Amino acid sequence: MMRCENMQELKPIKEGKVREIYDNGDSLIMVATDRISCFDVILNNEVTKKGAVLTQMSKFWFDMTEDILPNHMISVDTKDMPEFFQQEKFEGKSMMCRKLNMLPIECIVRGYITGSGWASYKENGTVCGIKLPEGLRESDKLPEPIYTPSTKAEIGDHDENISFEQSIDHLEKYFPGKGREYAEKLRDNTIALYKKCAEYALSKGIIIADTKFEFGLDEDGNMVIGDEMLTPDSSRFWPAEGYEPGHGQPSFDKQFARDWLKANPDNDWTLPQEIVDKTIEKYLQAYKMLTGKELA
């Protein structure tokens, strides 16, 4: 076991909206906090157990998809980590990961038309520049999943949707001569992962309407899944039972929180406890349905 002379001195090297990342020499330790963000803003509430759901659900999907693409996970057992992370507050929320050179694209895949995609479709029949068939209803399943990349925003900024061609140009700035190759790999891996996981989830009673992946390159230049994977934070999960296109669907994700914030614009980014409780109830329900286990 690694020892830490003064456990209080360990500080994250990067703090995202929800995650804290610590340097562990040749690896990183990613801690999913109980913070919740909506509309790219960190809310004032914390949602107890949320961080553990994110970490353990990511582990579940990482294990399931190793046949498609490797991932950055090394361990979620804090006994494998420095002593600092063996405090109770880190239990279940921490993941030791390989260091990657992260690619500057958020890889969004949509299997159903909803949210901002539905708003765009109603306006001009497209989603992120992709022309879709006429006559779609809100929440309809798309003929095929569509890939709609975006740039990665700094905290406080908004991600910007871009076309596939723009993603090539964006990647080319960071990886000269590799823009098209990496853009195509990101698209193809994103859709392959979504198709496999959406089929599995549907067999467990959950529709994955859309989700977001992030990828990086390992030391050998191989593409690897990073960040989180198919969690209620990065995805829209709907119950398959009662699914009915033509309107919005109930969800197992933070849509509860989003809906309340939209309905209460003078909210000061603070949720009522009732909405916090309903949100974690949905997260835990989704975890149990997908994994067959209660969260420890």
Explain the meaning of each model-derived region.
Residues 123-124, 132-181, 225, 229-290:
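Anionic ligand-binding catalytic core segments
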Residues 27, 102-104, 204-208, 220-223:
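Coil-to-beta-strand transition motifs
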Residues 6-9, 200-203, 224:
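Intrinsically disordered, low-complexity segments enriched in polar/charged residues with Gly/Pro
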Residues 177-209:
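A long amphipathic alpha-helix within ATP-dependent nucleotide-binding catalytic cores
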Residues 109, 208-229:
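Conserved metal-phosphate-binding beta-hairpin within the catalytic cores
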Residues 1-154, 267-296:
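Active-site loop/lid in soluble adenylation, ligation, and acyl-transfer enzymes
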Residues 39, 118-119, 220, 234-236:
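Intrinsically disordered, low-complexity acidic/polar segments
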